[in-house]
Amino acid sequence: MGYNFDRSISRRNTNAMAEEGFANYLFGADAPALALEMPREELISMWVADMQFAAPDAAIDAITERLKHPIFGYTADLDEQLYQAFHSWCAQRYSWHFAREEMQVSLGVIPALFALVEYVCRPGDKVLSLTPAYGYFKHAALQRDREFVTSRMLASDDGKYSIDFEDFEAKVSDPAVKLFFLCHPHNPTGRIWTSDELRRMGELCIANGVKIVSDEIHCDLLRTGNAHTPLAKLFPGSPDIITCMAVSKTFNLAGMMIATVIIPDPELRSEWKRRHYPFVNPLSLTAAIGAYRDGAPWLDALRLYLDENFALTQHFLSDHLPKAKFRVPEATYLAWIDLRTYFDDSVNLTRFFLEKSGVVLEGGEMFVENGDRRVRLNLACPRAQLRLSLERIRDAIVKQYH
């Protein structure tokens, strides 16, 4: 079956964050007015991590069928359908198994992060993460009155990131650290952590009484030839590991607001059930079941298309911005590009590229720390859009600095 990922789909007038909600998110309500050098309707959204592709028919058809039933009352994950579809997905793709009672449902991974900080940590406890980091790791800790501490990753000359285990061990040994947010695969760098890296992080956390929330939301979006190993698979039955996955990134269903959270610890699971909002959108539940049951062919085709988008990006940067450092990520649809040779620390790259090129992207300052003068570019878009964005980025750099 063919899939048309080259199709351009306008999202204007759909209340899409990607096109209509970026200003407050990226700059805040009190930021100075933007000095755009082109009309707002010509801006290109390359920032937030959802796709510019139509969701798979597997999800759309499931929603369409559910719409034939005219009642949309309170709904929860009460039967076996989601578990069977999701467990089968994980078993086939990752040889990973978990019991029905361990699987909980959340209104997205972000709400799960906020909840788990509160359920695991007391006020004043510390939450650890690797940086650069997904910003909501920090937000989840600070907005629940927990301290957020970091371990900076190391970047090699060719752009590959690794864990500074000496620093990580020192941080995780702090008795006040009670929770570690692991991003696996990693956003924004695209690393898939190896089994050795995962075991070492897991062993250090468990030895120090630190629970791990493994955010594996990007796990299905691998480059060809790569494989993902769920952290929990390496520590069977461990009560110290909570795994978050979702259809949102995999099948472009982020707005459906549904995620699965695997909680092996009976005590923590009881706390989750006692305090967590149990309902889900009936269309979201149906979409997730349909996607996991029948969405694999679409995903396989998508991954090949993304491989080609990354190859295009690598060749373009090599030819037109040779001082940029870029390594094709092992997973995700996000390009993490090092532009330190073109900019100094005084430039806010998010604002610069929006104003000078009309490309809405996220500068490294959006990723807590350790991302200075880098940008994250979302490549889950039609190839023509990607090519135009890269050309605009190149032209803005050349015009401003050379």
Regions found by a protein language model. Give the residues of each.
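Helix C-cap/helix->beta junction micro-motif
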Residues: 144, 207-208, 357, 400
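Conserved core of the PLP fold type I
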Residues: 71-203, 220-224, 228-234, 238, ...
